[in-house]
Amino acid sequence: MSRVGRLPIAVPAGITVTVTPDNVVTVKGPKGELVKTMHKDINIAVENNEVIVTRPSDQKAHRALHGLTRALINNMVIGVNEGYQKTLELVGVGYRAQLQGKKLVMNLGYSHPVEIEPIEGITFETPAATKVIVKGIDKEKVGAAAADIRKWRLPEPYKGKGIKFENEVIRRKEGKTGKK
């Protein structure tokens, strides 16, 4: 058995999980609703406020899908209950972020400001000029939106300038030593 897959998923009060015969999982909660189609070979059952994921055989593909399916459903349950967020920091002289309506506008040293429209289900917050918070209920979309923002200025290893995740550690390099 998969160590991840064999654990049942506890469904908190106020959250409903429904599974159709063709393995479409719908999770509704206080923050919204998520729908995802799971692989047809994996069996998903909802019993006594728990979601139980089982696999038909011990084939390598089924073992992999077992843990994956359980993790995806667990992420959906957490998302509609608590939501997800990623915090990005802008490090560099003149690097700033601000909101214009729902749109995120950043000055990153280019000749033009970088404007990013939020994808559906994602919101941006800027508590400080050098901090951006990406929030949403879908873990995959939150991570993708944060990665799209980060790719505009990846952190460089000499001074650490760029856009980095809050707890990310940038591996630093020493500069040239020069002639003596």
Curated annotation (Swiss-Prot):
Record keywords, A-Z: Ribonucleoprotein, Ribosomal protein, RNA-binding, rRNA-binding
Keyword rRNA-binding annotated: yes
InterPro entries given in the database record: Ribosomal_uL6-like, Ribosomal_uL6-like_a/b-dom_sf, Ribosomal_uL6_a/b-dom, Ribosomal_uL6_bac-type, Ribosomal_uL6_CS
Gene Ontology biological-process entries: cytoplasmic translation
GO (cellular component) term, any one: cytosolic large ribosomal subunit
Keyword Ribosomal protein in annotation: yes
GO molecular function terms attached to this record: rRNA binding; structural constituent of ribosome
Source superkingdom: Bacteria
Subunit structure: Part of the 50S ribosomal subunit.
Role description: This protein binds to the 23S rRNA, and is important in its secondary structure. It is located near the subunit interface in the base of the L7/L12 stalk, and near the tRNA binding site of the peptidyltransferase center.
Family indicated by similarity: Belongs to the universal ribosomal protein uL6 family.
Protein name, entry field: Large ribosomal subunit protein uL6
Organism this protein belongs to: Clostridium botulinum (strain Eklund 17B / Type B)
Organism classification: Bacteria, Bacillati, Bacillota, Clostridia, Eubacteriales
